[in-house]
Structures are given as structure tokens and as C-alpha cells.
Amino acid sequence: GHHPTEIAATMSAALPLGFKRVVVVFQPHRYSRTQDLADSFAHAFDGIDVLRVMDVFSAGELPIPGVSGKTVSSRVEVAHTVPDVRYIPSRRDLIADLLDTVKPGDLLITQGAGDVTQIGPMFIRALKERLQNH
């Protein structure tokens, strides 16, 4: 899900599973929804350890000036609900960040709408390459 209530439900289900940390990659859905729900995102990720926010999946919608994934990450940063929050619009930079951030024992969740579903497989491929080259 990509609505703040759905996100909060996923986070509350994941937290008691016993992982060292919960790392979430989130892709907001549509510029209008991101703008309308911006304040609701501030507490949607409560309790997780790491949040990486991608750019908005437009679903064919035209961009709204000043609305991006940064809109979400900024709300979470201001609310101080997640210790490590970053807005990373570049897929390449995001995968590089995850390779440095995700540790054994962590749970990585990809959530949202759009091509965020590709991030898990991309991360696994990059991790395998890193392990083969070391």
C-alpha cells in the first residue's frame, strides 16, 4: 500500500518480527496524493530505523511544482519519527546507499506504487555482485 494508513499497518506488523532494524524504501504515488497526504506521512513510518524515499510515481499525472519525494522525507525529518531519513531520487544512488546501509539481520521493505517493486531485485543483484567481487 501507499496510503499513510496502509504504510502504518505494514510498519506495525513488521516491527515485532525480531529483525535488528527495519529499512524501508518508499515511493509516493501521484503528485496530487503526495501533496494532499503530506502531513499524514510524518507518522506513517513511526518506529522504523531507516527510510529512503524515491521520487513520486506519477501514474501519468503532471508534476506539481514543489511536490516530490522530498515532500515526504521532509515531513518525516521534521517529526523526528525515523532516525535515518533520506530522499534519493536516483535509482543508482539508492542502490549504492542500500548496499552501504542494509546490514545482516535487517528487514528491507519496499513500499509504494510504481517501479519501487524493482528495487528489491536490483538490490539483490548488486549485493551478489559485490559479494562475488570481494
Give the predicted meaning of each segment.
Residues G1-H134:
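ATP-dependent carboxylate-amine ligase
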